[in-house]
Design a protein with these regions (language model features):
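Helix-turn-helix
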Residues: 7, 11, 15-57
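An amphipathic alpha-helix signature
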Residues: 9, 52, 92, 96, ...
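Short, basic, alpha-helical segments at the C-terminal edge of helix-turn-helix-like DNA-binding modules
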Residues: 56-63, 69-70
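Hydrophobic alpha-helical connector segments
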Residues: 66-108, 162-163
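Helix-loop "lid/cap" segments that line or gate small-molecule binding pockets
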Residues: 80-82, 96-104, 112-120, 194-199
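Amphipathic alpha-helical packing segments from all-alpha helical-bundle domains
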Residues: 103-116, 120-150
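Hydrophobic/aromatic-rich alpha-helical bundle segments in the mid-to-C-terminal region
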Residues: 127, 131, 135, 145-194, ...
């Protein structure tokens, strides 16, 4: 991606995160960059093309992070075998990496803020918010935990309940990170360590 296209994407997303996607025009984006609309159109067809490129970039980043940390990059229905050998350590590392990504990466943080704003204005954005930030991660963890339970890595329990219990603190701490100068990562790291200890077969035997 050229430097100009990158600047257009990051500037547009920052404006979307501040004012909402619908409220920002191509003229606003071009003006912020000090370029004409015609110059911007050399790189993107329209505002929707910019948004689609932003979403594609986020999905690519998520897939790359999944592969780097040894967790599935696709949904369970598409690649069930990739869920069979996921370790608790891989899930922990991926969770920490995702927390850093959503809170420390400016592009990801702006994407999350944009979705938070737009979920109440657009059914499409609400669906995207659910897929990226809410229901999607819960369903993903449910599938991982179901496989862990089936092979005895975790004790027998309702995988949906475990997914909700695991993801809820993550969701909350990501949300409050925008308003807190103190890092929430230590709290999350301690929690996920406790979670896997609590639901490990070894812990049940000790109890």
């Amino acid at each position: 991606m050229t430097d100009t296209k990158e600047k257009i994407l990051t500037t547009a997303l920052h404006l979307f995160a501040q004012d909402g996607y619908e409220a920002v025009s191509v003229s606003d984006i071009a003006g912020k960059l000090g370029m004409t609309k015609s110059a911007l159109y050399k790189h993107f067809r329209n505002k929707r093309d910019i948004l689609d490129s932003i979403v594609d970039r986020m999905y690519q980043a998520d897939s790359k992070s999944s592969q780097e940390h040894g967790v599935p990059a696709e949904k369970y229905d598409s690649a069930p075998d990739s869920y069979q050998d996921v370790s608790p350590e891989s899930v922990k590392e991926f969770t920490v990496a995702q927390f850093r990504f959503w809170t420390e990466d400016p592009f990801a943080a702006d994407f999350r803020r944009m979705l938070t704003l737009e979920q109440y204005r657009s059914a499409e954005m609400a669906k995207l918010y659910g897929s990226c930030v809410a229901e999607g991660p819960v369903a993903y963890m449910e599938d991982i935990f179901r496989e862990m339970i089936s092979r005895g890595t975790l004790i027998s329990a309702d995988p949906r309940r475990l997914a909700l219990e695991y993801y809820s603190p993550f969701f909350l701490l990501v949300s409050v990170s925008d308003r807190s100068e103190k890092s929430q990562l230590d709290i999350l790291t301690e929690y996920i360590g406790d979670f896997f200890r609590r639901y490990s077969p070894a812990h049940r035997e000790e109890s």
